[in-house]
Amino acid sequence: KNLTNDTGNSSYIYRLPGVFGKWCKPNYNSVVATFCHNISHDLPIQVNDPSFELSLVYIDDVIEEFVKVIQGERGGEKVPSVQPEYKIKLGDLSTQIQNFKESRDSLITEKVGSGIVRKLYSTYLSYLSPAQFAYSIPSYGDERGMFAEMLKTKDSGQFSFFTAGPGITRGGHYHHSKTEKFLVVQGEARFGFRHVASGETHEIITTSKKLKIVETVPGWSHDITNIGTKDMIAMLWANEIFNPDNPDTITHKV
């Protein structure tokens, strides 16, 4: 205050809550850094009071605020704060970071696109060693080709891909409520459709040289045939995670 009064220079006083983000030293004075480091390296963590509420700000938001000061976007003597400031219980924090780790096995991603979960996930990944940058996923193969699930979401379905050799047809079923989007990324394919009530048929030809999304529609049986001379590769999104107890997949010839 005296500096501002005596010289006219601007001054800013920040009282920061817990700051988290990449490169923070673990097992020192940041619970986020400690949890991210220890959980990612299969080391134990200690939660004394799961109900204790933390106040946190993200390092990128701190830097953005400080840059505004340096560039003169704030004037006069102030006691500003960094926003957004997040509130999270200690138990919820440990559970969230543990879920990040487990998502590689379940393939079910957390909602990492916005808010504190986005920033915690980026922070968690920054504590992985290079040997942990990649992980394997299951694949399933038969005479038709192979199939692998890549990513599952809690509320927006799942992503997978499959292959088929020349002349191979996959599918031959319909769904009551499940919907799908197909994208052929290598080769050529013919999609066949038949309305299960009226018998109406339809056909779509796609190729990786001219990318096209093909949607399956409830009540229409469908199949996909590789009409090219090399293996076909197709991406597949379904609006729900596959449930073997309720697959919503009924065999029906196209």
What feature does the model see in each segment?
Residues N2-W23, C36-H37, L43-F52:
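Conserved beta-loop-beta element that borders a ligand/cofactor-binding pocket
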Residues S177-V196:
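Glycine- and acidic-residue-biased ligand/ion/polar-headgroup-sensing regions
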Residues A131-G172:
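A short glycine-rich, His/Asp/Glu-containing loop-to-beta-strand
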Residues A197-E200, S221, T225-V254:
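Double-stranded beta-helix
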Residues S156, I168-K181, S208-K210:
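A short beta-loop-beta micro-motif enriched in histidine and acidic residues
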Residues I13, C24-T34, S51-Q71, G91, ...:
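Substrate-positioning beta->alpha
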Residues H195-T225:
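Short acidic-glycine-tyrosine-enriched beta hairpin
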Residues K68-S139:
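Mid/C-terminal beta-alpha module of Rossmann-like enzyme folds, strongest
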